[in-house]
Amino acid sequence: MEYKIIKNDTEYNLDDLTKLLNTSYWAKDRKKETVKKTVENSLCYFVYDTDKNKLIGFARAITDYTTNYYICDVIVDEEYRGEGIGKKLVETLINDEELIHLRALLITKDAKKFYEKFGFYNKEDVMQKDKK
């Protein structure tokens, strides 16, 4: 299977991306309008199965392009997991010329071992305020 990663794909299918994100525990109820707005305000990476022209992965970064960036919504279609696509997706994101010299942040409850392979480490001084 061949796949390609496209940065800031302007021709992505909003329905396909929403469906993919809705398969995750963190975005299972995310509305299409919200997905559209997050894409518009983020640096995004779309992964496509080139044989089927199907969206199979996605990740995005929120940044000021000066100090930090926050990685979020990293997902690979369940059917394609275990093939190294997530690894390649994260490598592409963290090695992006616009981000490589910035501090990367992320929040995960189940993928810590995965991100440690890229140099991420646990930091206990994170605070959160939930939305209303």
Regions found by a protein language model. Give the residues of each.
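Short amphipathic alpha-helix that is part of the acyltransferase structural core
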Residues: 1-32, 126
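A conserved beta-strand-loop-helix scaffold within acyl/acetyltransferase catalytic domains
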Residues: 39-51, 56-74
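Residue-level recognition of the GNAT/N-acetyltransferase active site
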Residues: 77
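Conserved acetyl-CoA pyrophosphate-binding loop and the N-cap/start of the following alpha-helix
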Residues: 80-89
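Conserved acyl-CoA
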Residues: 88-104, 113
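Conserved active-site alpha-helix within GNAT-family acetyltransferase domains
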Residues: 102-132
